[in-house]
Amino acid sequence: YYTSGLLRTEQTLAALYGDVPHVQLPGLREMDFGDFEMKSYQQLKDTAAYQAWIADVEHNPCPHGESAPQVLARNRAAMDRVLAAGEDAVCVIHGGVTAGLMMTWFGGGRYDYSVKPGTGFTVTFENGRPVSYIRVPK
């Protein structure tokens, strides 16, 4: 069992699987929104920094935060560590992290892999490569 170590993933793991031993991998955390953290759309919408970021959220980093490619690289490195263990694993992670990894592995867009709390995907790997997935629960 793996989580990002952030509260939501810890709570979700406990709700789904109980008090199980697990590894916290900070590399599985969601995007660091930097200066935008804990601010609402209403607070940000008219700022130049937010407008610059929103113009290309896939490539522009949040001020003092991360870009989507930076997050994905961090997430992929963490998943490589999970896969290197060569065992079945349960990863309780964030929706954006899930979407980014699934897009990398299977193509498509982020909304193809939207998840609700407590849901996700079972991904089958062969020789370290993703070969199929199913949505859980169905």
Task: State what each model feature region is.
Residues 1-49:
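Phosphate-coordination/substrate-recognition cap region in phosphate-metabolizing enzymes
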Residues 3-4, 73, 92-93:
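Short beta-strand scaffold positions
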Residues 8-9, 78, 97-98:
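Alpha-helix capping/helix-boundary segments
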Residues 16-22, 84-88, 107, 128:
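Short glycine/proline-enriched coil/turn segments at helix->beta-strand junctions
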Residues 41-54, 130-138:
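A polyampholytic, Gly/Pro-enriched intrinsically disordered region
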Residues 49-70:
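Short glycine/proline- and acidic residue-enriched helix-loop micro-motifs
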Residues 86-96:
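Generic beta-sheet signal
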Residues 108-133:
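Domain-level recognition of soluble alpha/beta enzyme cores
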